[in-house]
């Protein structure tokens, strides 16, 4: 594998898992990039599957400021849906595209430090980069790491981590280029038009106006944090058009660029 290209860190949400065509296009694009020597790391959530499993088990989905609250009695269901079902659905899609993938979680290889984020959120974790050895080994083989957002704390707690924040920590760890992919084309203004570029001041204004809210607020704030930390833009774009990803390899902008 070539070391002269930085790692492309792709974060995908749960909605992708319900779209066979979307997964197929994304994995095909990833395979094409890896074939050229581009290292690709996939980080995923799975909120839709978590909600389905909670409902099936008679549990309620609770959110606070766009972040999932994870009570102790829900953590086995959340871990199963994210580190289990969601992760393996993506591995199956990778296999169909001819990729060698490694299914993993934030708890593998001492990759991150994890702690409770906020007692009000229950078993929700906050993670920081720790050791890239395991990830780098996988990437150096030309394999695709597919990482769920489940972490393990030093005192043995299983923690549910917001997938955008998980992707941020891993992008920092491998000094990668982060792309937050969702089922919308990027950040939209009040009229539903795509905004090509945003900086911190513009983001704060749109949050105050209620244009950026809930899940997109979490996504944009995560993107801004990593953009500032790494001194380079982060992309917020759509997995619905995986062809766009090839533009990223060429250094072209897609979706909304969040500026440092």
Swiss-Prot record:
Q: Could you tell me where this protein is found in the cell?
A: Cytoplasm
Site location (Transition state stabilizer): 11, 219
| Reactions listed under catalytic activity | N-acetyl-L-glutamate + ATP = N-acetyl-L-glutamyl 5-phosphate + ADP
Q: Which class of enzymes does this protein belong to? A: transferase
- Pathway field: Amino-acid biosynthesis; L-arginine biosynthesis; N(2)-acetyl-L-ornithine from L-glutamate: step 2/4
Q: Which residues bind substrate?
A: 46-47, 68, 160
Q: What is its main location?
A: cytoplasm
- What does the record give as the function of this protein? Catalyzes the ATP-dependent phosphorylation of N-acetyl-L-glutamate.
Q: What is this protein called?
A: Acetylglutamate kinase
Gene from which this protein is expressed: argB
């Amino acid at each position: 594998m070539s070391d002269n290209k930085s790692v492309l860190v792709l974060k995908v949400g749960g909605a992708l898992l319900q779209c066979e065509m979307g997964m197929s296009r994304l994995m095909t694009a990833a395979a094409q990039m890896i074939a050229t020597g581009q290292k690709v790391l996939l980080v995923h959530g799975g909120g839709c599957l978590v909600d389905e499993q909670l409902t099936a088990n008679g549990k309620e989905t609770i959110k606070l400021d766009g972040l999932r609250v994870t009570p102790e009695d829900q953590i086995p269901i959340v871990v199963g849906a994210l580190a289990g079902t969601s992760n393996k659905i993506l591995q199956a899609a990778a296999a169909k595209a001819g990729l060698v993938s490694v299914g993993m979680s934030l708890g593998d290889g001492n990759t991150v430090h994890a702690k409770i984020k906020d007692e009000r959120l229950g078993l929700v974790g906050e993670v920081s980069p720790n050791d890239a050895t395991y990830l780098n080994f996988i990437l150096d083989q030309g394999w695709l790491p597919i990482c769920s957002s489940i972490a393990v704390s030093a005192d043995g707690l299983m923690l549910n981590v917001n997938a955008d924040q998980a992707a941020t920590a891993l992008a920092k760890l491998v000094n990668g280029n982060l792309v937050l992919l969702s089922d919308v084309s990027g950040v939209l203004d009040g009229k539903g038009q795509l905004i090509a570029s945003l900086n911190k001041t513009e983001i704060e204004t749109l949050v105050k106006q209620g244009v950026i809210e809930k899940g997109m607020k979490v996504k944009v704030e995560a993107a801004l944090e990593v953009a500032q930390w790494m001194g380079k833009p982060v992309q917020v774009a759509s997995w619905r058009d995986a062809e766009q990803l090839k533009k990223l390899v060429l250094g072209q902008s897609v979706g909304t660029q969040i500026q440092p």
